[in-house]
């Protein structure tokens, strides 16, 4: 089969970065995205799992989950699609203000879902939409991707975290979990076990907007609301918010599976 230029680019970038063995807080960290994808895979129907494997040409969802970050250096058209700037004091999502021209994560998820569900969409378009969707569903559940306090989602909110200088976004992108020294397999096993005690059908309820507003509330109450005076974040903040991160990763995986099961229900290999 002749590989198109788009297919070649997708393939090169899909496999360009090897899986990391330790956590890094550079973004909603790579292993966080991988864990979301692995949790989602547990909830896929066999039909959906086969469809995903076909669309990704055998690549795992975990490996596909980091593609959208790996292409940032040359795909600047997608930069604004990783987040939505809902003001911290807002009580509702207003698309005309917070997602002009559909340039936000909420609209991007819906577009990618539609491409996946479209039987007329090309294989390349479906592969790109799936890689974006896997990643964006992870980003949506990082609370600081859903809120803005005139500080670029916490990137300009300087804090000290367990004695070192950083910013609030990095804390929530991975440093909260990094501080425990956990490895991917142990953390995945822990979260998988936690799923047995959670009402997963309840997590599936709602819309993408509902889930973004849920993340916004967490940003208000937990991410910003628990910062000690002076911005010196210590163990008490970690202890209070580690369960929040755990729950968000589980929710992201469960909801990603729901979206994929629905979007690919009618998928037929070509």
Which role fits each region the language model picked out?
Residues 1-6:
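Bacterial N-terminal signal peptides that target proteins for export
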Residues 7-19:
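Hydrophobic h-region of N-terminal signal peptides that target proteins for export
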Residues 20-136, 143-270:
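N-terminal, motif-rich segments that launch catalysis or mediate targeting to/interaction with membranes
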């Amino acid at each position: 089969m002749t590989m198109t230029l788009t297919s070649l680019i997708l393939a090169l970038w899909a496999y360009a970065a090897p899986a990391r063995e330790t956590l890094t807080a550079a973004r909603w960290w790579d292993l966080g995205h991988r864990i979301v994808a692995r949790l989602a895979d547990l909830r896929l129907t066999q039909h959906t799992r086969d469809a995903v494997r076909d669309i990704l040409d055998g690549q795992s969802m975990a490996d596909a989950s980091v593609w959208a970050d790996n292409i940032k250096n040359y795909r600047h058209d997608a930069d604004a699609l990783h987040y939505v700037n809902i003001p911290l004091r807002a009580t509702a999502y207003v698309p005309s203000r917070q997602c002009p021209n559909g340039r936000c994560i909420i609209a991007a998820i819906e577009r990618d879902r539609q491409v996946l569900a479209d039987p007329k969409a090309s294989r390349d378009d479906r592969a790109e939409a799936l890689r974006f969707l896997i990643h964006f569903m992870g980003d949506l559940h990082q609370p600081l991707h859903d809120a803005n306090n005139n500080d670029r989602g916490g990137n300009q909110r300087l804090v000290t975290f367990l004695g070192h200088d950083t910013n609030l976004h990095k804390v929530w992108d991975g440093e909260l979990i990094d501080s425990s020294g956990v490895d991917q397999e142990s953390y995945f096993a822990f979260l998988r076990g936690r799923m047995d005690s959670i009402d997963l059908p309840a997590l599936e309820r709602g819309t993408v907007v509902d889930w973004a507003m849920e993340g916004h509330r967490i940003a208000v109450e937990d991410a910003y609301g628990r910062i000690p005076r002076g911005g010196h974040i210590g163990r008490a903040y970690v202890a209070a918010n580690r369960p929040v991160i755990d729950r968000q990763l589980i929710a992201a995986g469960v909801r990603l599976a729901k979206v994929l099961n629905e979007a690919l229900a009618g998928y037929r290999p070509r």
